[in-house]
Amino acid sequence: MKKLTQTMKWLTGSAVLVSMLALGACGEQQQQAAAPQEEQAEQAQQEVIVWKLAQTWGTGFPIFGDAVIKMADLVKAMSGGQMEIRIDSANKHKAALGILDMVKAGQYEMGHSASYYWKGKDPNTMFFSTMPFGMIAPEQYAWFYYGGGMDLMKKVYDKQGVYSFPGGNTGNQMGGWFAKEINTLEDLQGLKMRIPGFAGEVLSQLGVVVTNIAPGELYTALERGTIDALEWVGPSLDLNMGFQKIAPYYYTGWHEPATELQFMVNKEAFDGLPPHLQEILTVAMEFAAYDMYARSYHDSAVNWASIEQEYPEVRIRTFPPEIIAAMKEANRELLEESAAADPMFKEILDSQTAYMKMARKWTEISDYAYLKDNLE
């Protein structure tokens, strides 16, 4: 009996030992099998995804170009270096107004520009920059992110094979620099002016000869008399361009109350990113866009003071009521005509009009009422 008990203990111990050895061997096999998978995952994390971005702006262009750099820096930092975006300026790619085409074709994964530059390809893109007598920046951002604007922008750009995202706002722009004073509608007849977007179509109705010129060529065109007037941005950037040296009349705005730039992303390239990098890129673009708006406001305020102090020869003017009324009427007629011809145009116009009607009531009772009562 004692011997049987000893035998049973030996068998039990052996069984446990065999089981432990078997489990150990199995665990080792699982570890060996898992190792390549972990190595592959780690390798994927270490792979650096390098994209190229083409921008309309020249090398070192302030504010607009700075927003692109900020976005790229954020993507690299938030991804832990897994994704990098290399920026080509217009000085390199030589196609300042061809950004959409290059991103669509896959020459660049990303672009940064203003969507009204290709209104000739699709007039609906103008809505995502700005429209004359339209929303101001806070209203427009609210429309983009909470009022259906992003969905409408996606519908328009889907057929281009491109995703579009807000890329920075200039705020309310000035009406432009003029070689001569504008007092009547007759003064607009035959006037050669650089002004893009729907505003250019409005002024064409009033007799202005409208042209679109790349940013890097504006100063020379105005200085040489190729054009008589130009609209660029506002004090934040206009003083850097030197327009105050060659055109004495600086008019307040009507045409671009909230000009939004765009980040464009090749759809196939974006869809091919891992989800976490898609999210990082989206967040970086949104942050850079609103940061540019704050920077534009700051620089405009600082440079406006410089105009008053350093350039007393610059004469600030507002277009006479007669001209503003004619602009509004031409704008209304063109909008109605385009909406009747294009259902997509009408859908976006109806959306913006309804949202502005709602939001403007709050703007009037909040910002406008406060400013009206507190302006010195």
Go through each PLM region and give its residues.
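C-terminal motif of bacterial Sec signal peptides marking the signal peptidase cleavage site
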Residues: 22-25
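N-terminal secretory/targeting leader peptides
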Residues: 27-140, 152, 157-159, 163-376
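Bacterial N-terminal signal peptides that target proteins for export
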Residues: 2-14
